């Protein structure tokens, strides 16, 4: 599109009338409503571009080795070059693509992706490889959460212990009532507190991954209409054991939760192969 200053005066006026007043402002200050609006617009376009490309790459629509050009993405997504650049930078940080000078933006193989990033997890859960992703996450949680519960029993601050007990009781109420939206929020908070209460920052940094796992189960219809009563009891057992400082009981109850989770989800991955990541010879 030609720039305004090259157009005849009457056409300049017509096009100018279509531009939001904020777009004509040259100076914006912090707190200015226009600054907020424009930032929101930019963030929304950027988010849409990242989601569109990330979903297609992880879902296989854009296979390994596929090359994209920035100008084509501008046309496809109806966004500016700066939005494309920002989106590509995000995808690069996730290991999904690389930029090659005078070639373009190339899709990288799955073993180069960051499997711990919540975005990658969400996109995998939305695709055909959902079962394999659920298996990997369930096995990770099985290895970590019982240990985290045991550590929390010995290290968590009193306020966290009390909140955990309260949440476990609220989870039972929500589960019995079939209020799965509230149950999901409480379940996410429960497991986040267990990981955080361990006092291990590596465990605490898995909260995002666990959140995507629990959310994905609900979004993709992999949760029962009412949580198993035994599972609700095990959550309360974990909370009370942590509150009482009983690490062994906390670990055992958390392990029971994960064994039940695996039993419920196993049919979703029975026919999906495992992923073997190449090991570099350094």
Q: Where in this protein do the model-derived segments appear?
A:
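Short linear motifs at protein or domain termini
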Residues: 5-6, 11-14, 18-143, 150, ...
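Short, flexible helix-adjacent loops and helix caps
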Residues: 58, 62, 149, 153-157, ...
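Short loop-to-helix capping motifs
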Residues: 70, 178, 199-201, 245-246
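A generic "binding-loop/recognition-motif" signal
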Residues: 103, 190, 199
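All-alpha effector-binding/dimerization core of bacterial HTH-type transcriptional repressors
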Residues: 112-189, 230-256
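C-terminal all-alpha effector/ligand-binding and dimerization domain
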Residues: 165-168, 172, 189, 205-282
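Short basic (Lys/Arg) and small-residue
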Residues: 194
């Amino acid at each position: 599109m030609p720039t305004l200053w090259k157009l005849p005066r009457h056409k300049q006026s017509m096009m100018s009338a279509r531009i939001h007043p904020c777009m004509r402002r040259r100076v914006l200050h912090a707190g200015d409503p226009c600054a907020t609006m424009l930032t929101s617009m930019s963030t929304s376009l950027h988010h849409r571009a990242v989601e569109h490309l990330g979903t297609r790459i992880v879902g296989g629509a854009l296979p390994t080795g596929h090359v994209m050009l920035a100008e084509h993405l501008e046309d496809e997504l109806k966004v500016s070059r700066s939005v494309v650049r920002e989106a590509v930078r995000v995808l690069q940080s996730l290991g999904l693509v690389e930029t090659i000078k005078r070639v373009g933006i190339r899709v990288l193989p799955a073993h180069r992706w960051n499997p711990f990033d919540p975005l990658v997890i969400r996109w995998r859960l939305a695709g055909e490889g959902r079962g394999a992703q659920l298996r990997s996450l369930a096995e990770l949680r099985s290895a970590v959460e019982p240990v985290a519960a045991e550590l929390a029993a010995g290290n968590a601050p009193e306020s966290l212990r009390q909140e955990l007990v309260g949440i476990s009781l609220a989870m039972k109420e929500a589960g019995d009532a079939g209020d799965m939206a509230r149950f999901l929020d409480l379940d996410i908070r429960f497991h986040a507190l267990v990981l955080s209460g361990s006092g291990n920052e590596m465990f605490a940094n898995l909260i995002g991954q666990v959140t995507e796992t629990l959310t994905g189960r609900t979004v993709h219809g992999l949760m029962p209409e009412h949580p198993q009563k035994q599972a609700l009891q095990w959550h309360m057992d974990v909370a009370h054991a942590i509150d009482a400082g009983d690490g062994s009981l906390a670990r055992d109850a958390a392990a029971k939760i994960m064994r039940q989770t695996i039993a419920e989800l196993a049919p979703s991955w029975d026919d999906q192969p495992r992923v073997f990541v190449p090991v570099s010879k350094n």
